[in-house]
A protein has these predicted regions:
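Membrane-interface loop-to-helix entry segments
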Residues: 27-32, 36-69, 84, 122-129, ...
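Hydrophobic alpha-helical segments and their helix-loop junctions in multi-pass secondary transporters
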Residues: 12-15, 24, 40, 56-82, ...
Length: 317
């Protein structure tokens, strides 16, 4: 989903800002759909090299956008005087914010496993998600309030940030795209029990491109709400498994007996995701709590059933 949205976004940005014919939009989606996966195709070193260039460039764009918006609205007094045309409930707003980063956060270990130490991994994650992602959310919300326009492409056009914005936005989207498809490949290889990472990467790019061609760009808000509902329960299962079942200490990978799938985890996840999706309250929190509680209950039920089976077999002897 994210890959499809990013692919469609950069194609639409180029067509609008460079005044290209509308007929170029779909071919550009195909071009970027497969082009964005090149660094992920190379591997982690490709991701790292691109990020070293793109992150500073995106920081410059964010600062420029904030400064321009502040100037256009007339400073802090002008900003406080703006009355939004539409409103969201607090629960929906929180769900949308969760949706912007929860997918990447849940799969962050795909990158942090390359860190020099666990301390570096933790701090890098905290800085990246809270400061980096937080700054991007603030910038997007700031522009939406000032210009009464939720579309980031239209905001950049209104600010007059044309060519520089195209280059910086392109780099930023590329870092999002290659990390997204890298995660897809890692999960896909694990699911399919294959080491053909590059083939899975291309397959993911193909699916993402099809979704982009199908109109994913228009579905960003519903997609964020969906992500904010169905992804957080995964974290609930992981936390319950780590802190409750394994008491905060997983066995070494070489010594662990890994099942083909965790039936308890899957059942708890489905229950948590369903409750989050249909909940009238803050969906991500509901999903995490329900999934974690369900996993603990199912685990204890399984352990009790196994204990009774052992006792029955012992008595039979």
């Amino acid at each position: 989903g994210w890959y499809a949205w990013g692919t469609a976004t950069i194609a639409i940005v180029l067509v609008r800002l460079l005044a290209l014919p509308e007929s170029w939009t779909l071919p550009l989606m195909v071009l970027f759909g497969f082009g964005f996966c090149l660094t992920a195709f190379v591997g982690y070193k490709g991701l790292d090299l691109l990020s070293r260039i793109a992150v500073p460039a995106m920081l410059i764009l964010l600062i420029a956008s904030l400064w321009t918006a502040t100037r256009d609205v007339g400073g802090l007094d002008g900003l406080l005087a703006v009355e939004p045309g539409d409103s969201l409930t607090l629960g929906m707003a929180i769900t949308m914010i969760f949706g912007t980063f929860v997918s990447g956060a849940t799969q962050a270990t795909n990158w942090t496993r390359f860190a020099r130490s666990s301390k570096v991994a933790v701090w890098a994650s905290l800085i990246g998600f809270f400061i980096g992602n937080g700054l991007m959310i603030v910038t997007g919300a700031y522009g939406a309030i000032v210009y009464q326009q939720p579309d980031i492409v239209e905001v950049l056009v209104l600010q007059g940030l044309s060519m520089a914005a195209v280059v910086m936005l392109f780099l930023n989207l590329w870092t999002t795209q290659d990390n997204t498809i890298y995660n897809f490949a890692a999960a896909g290889c694990n699911l399919l029990r294959t080491e053909r990472r590059r083939l899975v990467t291309l397959g993911g790019a193909f699916v993402g491109t099809l979704l982009a061609l199908g109109g994913m760009y228009e579905l960003l808000i519903p997609f964020l709400i969906l992500l904010g509902s169905i992804i957080p329960p995964i974290g609930g299962v992981i936390m319950a498994d780590y802190f409750y079942r394994h008491r905060g200490q997983y066995p070494k990978l070489a010594e662990a007996r890994l099942p083909k799938y965790n039936s308890l985890g899957l059942a708890a996840y489905v229950l948590g995701a369903a409750c989050a999706y249909f909940s009238p309250w803050v969906a991500p929190i509901v999903g995490i709590l329900v999934a974690a509680a369900a996993y603990i209950v199912l685990y204890e039920g399984q352990r009790l059933a196994l204990s009774r089976t052992v006792l029955t077999q012992t008595d039979a002897r």
